[in-house]
Amino acid sequence: MSCLHVSSRSLPLDSLPRRGVGIISRPRPTLARIVTTPTWVPVLVATFLIIASLLLAFAVTDVGRQAFVDQWERSRLAFGQSLDDTEYARMEARSASLAPLYALGSALVTVLIPFIVAGTVRLALRPTEGATPSFGQVLAVLSHANVVLALRQVVATPVAFVRESLSSATTVVQLVPSLDETSPLARFFGGVDLFVVWWIVVAALGLSILYRRPARQLVASMTLAYLV
């Protein structure tokens, strides 16, 4: 299987912490170096551990357990399922064991995202002349983009603890608190996570290097897919 060779400085690949900082501060040159020696396991494990440890630390507190119960209640109501006092009390009683499992499951989802998106990208984007990236290169780009999701959890966890809620900690709606919560615009902004958009931008920058396509075009396409 042929791989794309990207011209960059002939320096050894930076350490994992330096790559993480580079993804945040200088994503394009960092990704240009990453795709020359694509690795994805270390960064995927590291970001998973960060996200999982923060979610679990929150889930074992009284505030965290109650926040998870409230989240479950909102999810059931969103699907039109009523919840009486007995069922709510049962959820509270089981929260000590279920909240950590829910937190761990949420962290595992972030591990699956790069694989799912990588598979989709391989199907949707045809290699251009002179650009035939391998699956490993695509996966390396998307896995390093998960640094943004780890940073998201670093920000969201203390906010969730203060607000005693898991909802809308890093969404656009937080920037416009004057909006009526029941308005269509508020509901739309409540579903747009700033860090997910950042993740898309970082991923698109890396994919633009691999597939030699305009980054803006990829950002627009991926953002549209996210919003839809």
Each model region followed by its residue ranges:
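Alpha-helical transmembrane segments
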Residues: P17-G20, V43-L44, L104-A107, V111, ...
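Short, intrinsically disordered terminal tails adjacent to the first/last structured region
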Residues: M1-L11
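Selected alpha-helical membrane-embedding segments in polytopic membrane proteins
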Residues: S25, P29-L151
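Short alpha-helical transmembrane interface motifs in multi-pass membrane proteins
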Residues: L13, Y102-V109, L185-G190
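Short, membrane-interfacial amphipathic segments enriched in basic
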Residues: R9-S25, R94, T132
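Hydrophobic alpha-helical transmembrane segments and adjacent short intramembrane/lumenal linkers
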Residues: G136-V228
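Charged, low-complexity, helix/coiled-coil-prone segments
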Residues: L13-V21, G80-Y88, S165-S168
